[in-house]
């Protein structure tokens, strides 16, 4: 969507984030670096994405020290928003934390996303579109694990601000669960072959389509800092999380 219609992403992620930051500053502060007493422990939590780092080669993982190198209008808008958050901390003293997560999956995800699309099209006996050669790699994070990570980071930031009035930090949230898109499609089809068998395998519906513009080859998050500093660890591996996800979408799409 950001490739066909980037306007809404620019307005929401850049201008929208600036509106929130500016409102927070005007509400919380008397002047730069001087907070109102009732907002001493307030801070801004920016939830971002691993896409801001750009595309990786075959080796290595994104750490919090990686430079931003976004390659699509969406990732550029998120990178711009992150930079605005950073600027409000350094310019005005607004406490802030940024978390950059890997690909989320699980119940209630938007229908256009990869995993819901594979399941929905498989169940509807439609083509299952896979961009390019299907070998684009993503690090996958179950949505509930992401929620727990966000809560843990929030609590950590709140306690740190009690100790020190100035606070800014960045955390990557990932699971070291790297999967090619084609492998995900095959896993889902195999699952459906077992629980909802039909005359032919669902894998026969997989269709390779023209790659989309700006399609980064590989993302991979290094969550070491989050694990070391806060003690967070994902509770779902990709297999267990995907099983729960498929079961949820079968109920949604089949009733």
Task: List PLM regions with ranges.
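C-terminal substrate-binding subdomain of Rossmann-fold SDR/epimerase-dehydratase oxidoreductases
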Residues: 116, 122-255
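Intrinsically disordered, low-complexity segments enriched in polar/charged residues with Gly/Pro
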Residues: 46, 106-107, 205-207
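Short, hinge-like loop/turn segments at secondary-structure boundaries
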Residues: 63-64, 115-117
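N-terminal Rossmann-like NAD(P)+-binding domain of SDR-like oxidoreductases, especially those catalyzing
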Residues: 1-104, 124, 147, 153, ...
